[in-house]
């Protein structure tokens, strides 16, 4: 989660954490909105808004719901193959059930994957980002050895360039984890900005990934600088899609086409269609 400016602001991460597997938010007493003594710390409201955004994304989007469902799918095989100390007893030679593989596939599609970040890596401030065009892979989901769905998944090769000119190459498959952090940080940042925090300190000590990666990625995908409102909207609607990475690519491509061709109304139509399909999906499972 994001760091906070020591004197002027309180940001999510040091003081708050959302646990998607348990559906609860933990915020330390320093982030209280009604502290026992004195006034709330600057940025306390932004902290709560950040974590509540994760809560909403996990409970009210397709990516969040399916991430949770895929975890439920793994409960039975875990119990079946674990001893009383929760140690898995299946040997490495044992065959893995197709349904278990599919559960992990769905989880990875929904939550996303980022490859190439060294273990324990401490992100310095990135001076710039370089992104390649997204590449497509089709993931097959099976049940009882039969293919029940095919999902388009997009990955973006990315390079972070730092102030000392060294760089780090990673691959981002956008999903719930990356997109929700990007959207939550945009909301948090806007609240702090509107509260009077200086622009010079809004991103101070904030890790470049994932918080400061979402904005340049969206800018790249739409072909021009984006607004905070656009990034929040694009990210949220991407999470309503059956594939968050595809949802983000599709939404950004609609804006890009509008800009290139000078058309109007295409993005509004896309959002209406996306919302219609999500409501239809949600009504079908409730």
Where does each model-flagged region fall?
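Catalytic zinc-binding patch centered on the HExxH motif and its immediate surroundings
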Residues: 1-39, 69-84
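Long, well-structured alpha-helical subdomains associated
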Residues: 95-183, 188-286
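Post-HEXXH active-site segment of zinc metalloproteases
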Residues: 38, 42, 58-99
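Short pre-active-site segment immediately N-terminal to the catalytic Zn-binding motif
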Residues: 27-49, 170-175
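Active-site recognition of the HExxH zinc-binding catalytic motif
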Residues: 46-60, 181-185
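Intrinsically disordered, low-complexity segments enriched in charged and polar residues
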Residues: 1, 11, 43, 50-53, ...
């Amino acid at each position: 989660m994001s760091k906070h400016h020591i004197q002027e602001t309180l940001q999510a991460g040091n003081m708050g954490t959302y646990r998607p597997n348990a559906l609860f938010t933990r915020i330390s007493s320093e982030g209280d909105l009604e502290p026992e003594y004195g006034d709330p710390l600057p940025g306390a409201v932004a902290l709560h808004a950040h974590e509540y955004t994760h809560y909403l994304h996990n409970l009210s989007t397709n990516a969040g719901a399916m991430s949770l469902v895929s975890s439920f799918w793994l409960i039975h095989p875990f119990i079946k193959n674990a001893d009383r100390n929760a140690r898995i007893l299946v040997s490495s030679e044992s065959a893995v059930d197709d349904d278990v593989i599919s559960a992990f596939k769905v989880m990875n599609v929904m939550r996303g994957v980022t490859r190439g970040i060294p273990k324990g890596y401490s992100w310095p401030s990135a001076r710039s980002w370089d992104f390649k065009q997204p590449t497509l892979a089709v993931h097959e989901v099976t049940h009882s050895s039969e293919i029940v769905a095919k999902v388009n998944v997009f990955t973006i090769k990315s390079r972070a360039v730092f102030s000392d000119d060294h760089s780090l190459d990673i691959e981002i498959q956008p999903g719930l984890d990356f997109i929700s952090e990007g959207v939550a940080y945009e909301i948090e940042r806007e609240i702090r900005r509107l509260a009077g925090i200086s622009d010079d300190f809004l991103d101070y000590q904030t890790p470049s990934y994932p918080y400061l990666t979402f904005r340049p990625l969206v800018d790249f995908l739409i072909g021009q600088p984006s607004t905070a409102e656009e990034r929040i909207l694009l990210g949220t609607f991407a999470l309503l899609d059956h594939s968050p990475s595809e949802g983000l690519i599709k939404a950004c491509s609609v804006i890009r086409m509008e800009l290139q061709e000078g058309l109007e109304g295409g993005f509004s139509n896309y959002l209406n269609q996306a919302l219609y399909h999500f409501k239809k999906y949600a009504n079908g499972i409730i």
